[in-house]
Amino acid sequence: MYIYWILLGLAIATEITGTLSMKWASVSEGNGGFILMLVMISLSYIFLSFAVKKIALGVAYALWEGIGILFITLFSVLLFDESLSLMKIAGLTTLVAGIVLIKSGTRKARKPELEVNHGAV
């Protein structure tokens, strides 16, 4: 089961890299950023598609998108001098709270109990 969480982590990391490279491509010369964006976002969807084999789709997608937005925003501030207003901080805080609630509200499906037949009476 852990491999699927690792795949989800890879999906998140490649989504962050792909989205940041989109911004990098828009402010720099050449096509390197666009190529990196295409490769990373493609890999992100591939990793996500494998992760949802064992992780609930709603949970996987919420984590993928939510954690992606959080880190893309933080890296955009650090790398591209974008602003981080109080309203953005409040939104990110709400996002993190939502991710925690979605993850904590997910239960594993119970395995069906085996019926024991002690013989016909």
Curated annotation (Swiss-Prot):
Keywords: Cell inner membrane, Cell membrane, Membrane, Transmembrane, Transmembrane helix, Transport. Residues 1, 53-54, 103-121 are cytoplasmic. GO terms for biological process: choline transport; glycine betaine transport; spermidine transmembrane transport; xenobiotic detoxification by transmembrane export across the plasma membrane. It is a multi-pass membrane protein. Pfam families: Multi_Drug_Res (PF00893). InterPro entries: Small_drug/metabolite_transptr, Small_multidrug_res, Spermidine_export_MdtJ. The chain crosses the membrane at residues 2-22, 32-52, 55-75, 82-102. It comes from the Bacteria. Residues 23-31, 76-81 are periplasmic. One of its GO terms (cellular component) is plasma membrane. Induction: Induced by spermidine. It is found in: Cell inner membrane. Changing Y45L: Decrease in spermidine excretion. GO terms for molecular function: amino-acid betaine transmembrane transporter activity; antiporter activity; choline transmembrane transporter activity; spermidine transmembrane transporter activity. Forms a complex with MdtI. Catalyzes the excretion of spermidine. Can also confer resistance to deoxycholate and SDS. This is Spermidine export protein MdtJ. It comes from Escherichia coli (strain K12). The gene is mdtJ.
